[in-house]
Swiss-Prot record:
Substrate binds at K47, N71, A72, M73, G74, L75, N125, N190, T191. Heterotetramer of 2 PyrK and 2 PyrD type B subunits. Its cofactor is FMN. GO terms for biological process: 'de novo' pyrimidine nucleobase biosynthetic process; 'de novo' UMP biosynthetic process. One of its GO terms (cellular component) is cytoplasm. This is Dihydroorotate dehydrogenase B (NAD(+)), catalytic subunit. FMN binds at S23, K47, S48, N125, K163, I189, G215, G241, G242, G263, T264. It comes from the Archaea. The gene is pyrD. It catalyses: (S)-dihydroorotate + NAD(+) = orotate + NADH + H(+). Keywords: Cytoplasm, Flavoprotein, FMN, NAD, Oxidoreductase, Pyrimidine biosynthesis. Its EC number is 1.3.1.14. Pathway: Pyrimidine metabolism; UMP biosynthesis via de novo pathway; orotate from (S)-dihydroorotate (NAD(+) route): step 1/1.
Length: 302
């Protein structure tokens, strides 16, 4: 029996398989990145890192719903200096994508310069829906996306991935801005702006009131975004949003995603999701007569 090839090359980086741990709530420390890889992730995106340390919002920061989670963590992170101290002494045998956020193109560029030694690539958080002055507030405008990507590309020779917000009328405008500025890839989607209300307290549950919705409920929205981006752009698209089963993963690949990120499914189903999804993809490829993941990317676009 010939095993189908799961390994991929993305922007010059070699991944054992197309599954990447998404930036979110399961990737704060190196031990979690290593665990993700041991459990079958081909690579890892870190928690978003800023210039100064941030405590994040007070609890409650997460609400579990029947079809996903709403979170408003508030971008808690140790700052770039704390991040460098945290990774000191570690070496990783998988691609480490460092997520960064800032309030201006200059801040993004500064972080890329400072963290280039430890990052195999950068993911630009242009899409967090609940942090004032950051993320989506910057990334909803194509001209801002262009300026940030260009500044980071000028500051580092590492691959640059722009993470796009779905909270906009046409996500391809953002994708084209990133591509025109020299981005090596885009990732989509970040969470959908959302709220949950306690009917007895008669007020929003999250301390920040508004958060980002992720998980199985956002999958069709994410899939459509990936499909539209893959039809429009020449650079790779990394699919994110509600991927929970191998069937979900195959849908995203067929819709044009070159790689996939998984976050909420780890919270809901445990680290085993990486292995289960990889096994399902490999079995699907074999049974359908394909020899590699790359052969099915974008087949649904034709």
């Amino acid at each position: 029996m010939t095993v189908a090839k799961l390994s991929i090359n993305l922007s010059g980086l070699e991944f054992e398989n197309p599954l990447i741990l998404a930036s979110g709530i399961n990737d704060k420390v190196p031990e979690q990145w290593i665990r993700a890889h041991e459990e079958g992730a081909g690579g890892v995106v870190t928690k978003s890192i800023g210039i100064e340390p941030r405590k994040g919002y007070d609890n409650p920061t997460i609400v579990e719903l029947p079809y996903g989670l709403i979170n408003a963590m508030g971008l808690p992170n140790p700052g770039w200096k704390g991040f460098l101290e945290m990774v000191e002494g570690y070496s990783f045998d998988f691609p480490l994508i460092v997520s960064i956020f800032g309030g201006t193109p200059e801040e993004f560029a500064f972080l890329a310069e400072k963290l280039s030694e430890v990052a195999d690539a950068f993911e630009l958080n242009l899409s967090c829906p609940h942090a004032k002055g950051y993320g989506m507030e910057i990334g909803q405008k194509p001209e801002n996306v262009y300026a940030v990507v260009k500044a980071v590309k000028d500051a580092t020779d590492k691959p640059v991935i722009a993470k796009l917000t779905p909270n906009i009328d046409d996500i391809t405008k953002l994708g084209l801005a990133a591509e025109n500025a020299g981005a090596d890839a885009v990732s989509a989607i970040n969470t959908l702006k959302a709220i949950a209300i306690d009917i007895y307290a008669r007020k929003p549950i999250l301390s920040n009131k508004v958060g980002g919705y992720s998980g199985p409920g956002v999958k069709p929205v994410a899939l459509r975004a990936v499909y539209d981006l893959a039809r429009t752009l020449d650079i790779p698209v990394i699919g994110i949003g509600g991927i929970t089963t191998w069937q979900d993963a195959v849908e995203f690949l067929l819709a044009g995603a070159s790689a996939l990120q998984i976050g909420t499914a780890v919270s809901l189903r445990g680290w085993k999701v990486f292995r289960e999804i990889n096994e399902g993809i490999e079995r699907y490829l074999r049974e359908e007569g394909f020899s590699s993941v790359e052969e099915i990317v974008g087949l649904a676009l034709e």
